[in-house]
Amino acid sequence: KMNETAVSGISVSGAHEGNLQIPEGIKKTVCPDGLPERFKDVAGGMGSDMDMLVKESSAGAVLLSADSDVSGEPARIRFAYGAFEHSLNTFGILAKEGSNMTVIMDMAAERSVDPERTGSPSPVGENPAAVSQSEHTGLSAVQTKLILEKDAKVTLVQIIRNKNAKTVLNDIGAKVADGAKLSVIHLFLGGDRVYNGCKAELIGKKSNFTADIAYTVADDCVLDMNYVALHEGKK
């Protein structure tokens, strides 16, 4: 449940097979059992129900970490979702003290049934171009948890344009330490029912969080957004 909206009957079949382009200076770690213990108390904007969904999915996680300024070359994560796919992906972003990194996530609908395309295969005989949006039953869920250590900077860009999804769940949770800065940029361009929750805990002195949001919502579609900045540190 988020805001006054309750989403029920959610189930996932595993993680979506995205295309990750990770530049030098950012370390990628696959975590089959989920994110490391230090991420457990990072609360997301969609609440504990999303954490439970992640736990029940047993889909594992991917951790991206940096310990220097690598902002000149972003990490890019591209998704190409099918019309009947039910998937969940979990990402952790660890920006160590003094580091600077940018992560771009492009969550799109698949364009063809080319076997060389990025993403999970479609059911046999499915041609996404021939499937009307009213027939789509797909669900795409992404949870991203971030830890920014002292004086770290992270820019997280998420482009949500998955017209193949009946339901889109996007969850962000962050802990921001002394002098650290988190910038979230959101572009919402597609999806039948899109639910987005973002929570940043500013636990350090002069910690900072900004969110820049742009969106288009078609007739009869839903975009439910929730952004929380919890300031616990000193000014």
Language-model features: where?
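Long, low-complexity, mixed-charge
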Residues: 1-62, 69
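Conserved beta-strand/loop scaffold segments within soluble protein domains that form the structured core
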Residues: 42-116, 129, 134-235
